[in-house]
């Protein structure tokens, strides 16, 4: 799971329903480490890594807070950042080398890098049963973002995924669920 911040109900419910699941999270924000530490004090056994997703592993990049609460950061510099921290990056290829390629669920909420990660999943030939993605349309040109969204949805559909809207948001985000029915149990 990528992008933790203060919200890990999904991960906690995965643990409640599967005691043996290996749950891994990546998010370099200080709040995310506190969130996971709190959950783990309750016995949830979540393995957390303080790194940001990017196409290249091992880079040190600026991570910008997009609001003054410092709960949401992104790699793309916003017009008026409220804070910045330096973070190390990691990509899916490196993660697969470290943890293996057998994955059931990939969840991502990684402000502005959704297209890169959804593409890397396909390029690596990973075979998750479900991918949950928050796709921010407000980072960059709106029309270009929607063209990328249409393109990635089509690529997933071509290899047997059914794509659903997970939740209608109030902002300029699209939450999608990419599901492989023959692999997943609802």
Residue ranges and their predicted role:
Residues 1-186:
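Phosphate/nucleotide-binding beta-alpha loop and adjacent structural elements of enzyme active sites
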């Amino acid at each position: 799971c990528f992008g933790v911040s203060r919200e890990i109900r999904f991960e906690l419910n995965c643990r409640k329903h599967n005691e043996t699941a290996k749950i891994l999270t990546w998010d370099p924000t200080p709040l995310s480490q506190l969130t996971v530490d709190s959950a783990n004090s309750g016995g949830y056994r979540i393995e957390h890594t303080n790194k940001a997703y990017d196409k290249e592993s091992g880079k040190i990049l600026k991570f910008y807070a997009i609001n003054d609460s410092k709960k949401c950061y992104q790699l793309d510099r916003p017009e008026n950042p409220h804070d910045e921290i330096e973070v190390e990056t990691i990509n899916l290829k490196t993660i697969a080398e470290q943890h293996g390629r057998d994955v059931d669920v990939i969840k991502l909420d990684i402000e502005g890098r959704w297209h890169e990660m959804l593409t890397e999943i396909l390029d690596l030939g990973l075979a998750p049963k479900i991918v949950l993605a928050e796709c921010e349309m407000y980072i960059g040109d709106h029309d270009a973002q929607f063209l990328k969204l249409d393109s990635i949805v089509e690529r997933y559909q071509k290899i047997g995924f059914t794509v659903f809207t997970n939740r209608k948001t109030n902002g300029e985000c699209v939450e999608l669920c990419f599901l492989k029915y023959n692999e997943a149990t609802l």
